[in-house]
Regions:
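Bacterial N-terminal signal peptides that target proteins for export
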Residues: 2-16
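Eukaryotic helix-grip
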Residues: 28-241
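Bacterial N-terminal signal peptides
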Residues: 14-24
Length: 241
């Protein structure tokens, strides 16, 4: 009985952390994310090819995290995954529903997603604005994700999360890609900061490892980046198009 109960609590806490990491929403006046190269980052853990750093944030009980990984896939594969509005279910831990909505473009588009929570915690949903930009000179691609919680009606069976900032940067290194993921979240509900901060490592590690594996699937092979005359990224398409 003790073992079963402990397992239940572990799954509950892991589910809560999945919410904090994958739900990417912005407050009306969010504090800016700490820069990637800020002095305050402290290495928290290194798991295989993923390194997790954390940093305390002034006025917040919750730490920011930075995850850095050397992924053994080319940037074209990764971007083919990232532009798929349903790919959240493939690589983001605990994401069970995801789809695009609205009249978006490659540079600015919208998605709705649901994060599975273990009973008795209610599933969380979120509405995202996803902005993507790339520079042909460096080959780097940056994605920022912020919530627009009022763009879609809420469901009684789900709780909408409305505060977080996320930044992805993809740096091509030949047939490999360096990925940097920075996030700071102020979660809804009465979750103590000490608990969240103690579990902040697990979810980004699992998600980035899954992303590397998913990007090797056949459906994400043989894509190319489409650059405009101004050197800005315009889209991602199969190589034959």
């Amino acid at each position: 009985m003790i073992s079963t109960r402990a397992h239940g609590f572990q799954r509950l806490f892991t589910g809560m952390m999945g919410l904090l990491i994958t739900l990417t929403a912005a407050a009306s006046k969010p504090a800016p994310l700490p820069p990637e190269q800020a002095d305050g980052w402290s290495l928290r853990q290194e798991v295989d090819n993923v390194r997790i750093y954390t940093m305390e944030r002034e006025g917040s009980s919750f730490e920011a995290f930075k995850a850095v990984a050397e992924l053994d896939v080319p940037i074209e594969n990764l971007m083919a995954v990232m532009i798929n509005p349903e790919s959240c279910k493939e690589w983001v831990h605990n994401c069970i529903e995801s789809y695009a909505f609205g009249q978006g473009s490659f540079q600015e588009r919208y998605a709705y997603s649901v994060n599975d929570m273990p009973w008795p915690v209610t599933d969380r949903d979120y509405v995202l604005r996803i902005q993507t930009q790339g520079d042909a000179t460096t080959g780097e691609i940056i994605m920022t994700l912020n919530a627009m919680p009022d763009m879609r009606a809420e469901f009684n069976s789900r709780v909408r999360v409305d505060r977080s900032d996320t930044h992805y940067r993809f740096i091509p290194e030949g047939e490999r890609t360096r990925m940097v993921w920075v996030q700071h979240t102020e979660p809804n509900g009465a979750l103590p900061g000490w608990l969240v901060n103690s579990l902040i490592v697990d979810i980004p590690v699992k998600s980035m490892q899954a992303l590397e594996a998913v990007a090797k699937h056949n459906r994400y092979q043989n894509h190319r980046l489409q650059w405009g005359d101004d050197g800005q990224l315009q889209g991602v398409a199969p190589a034959g198009r």
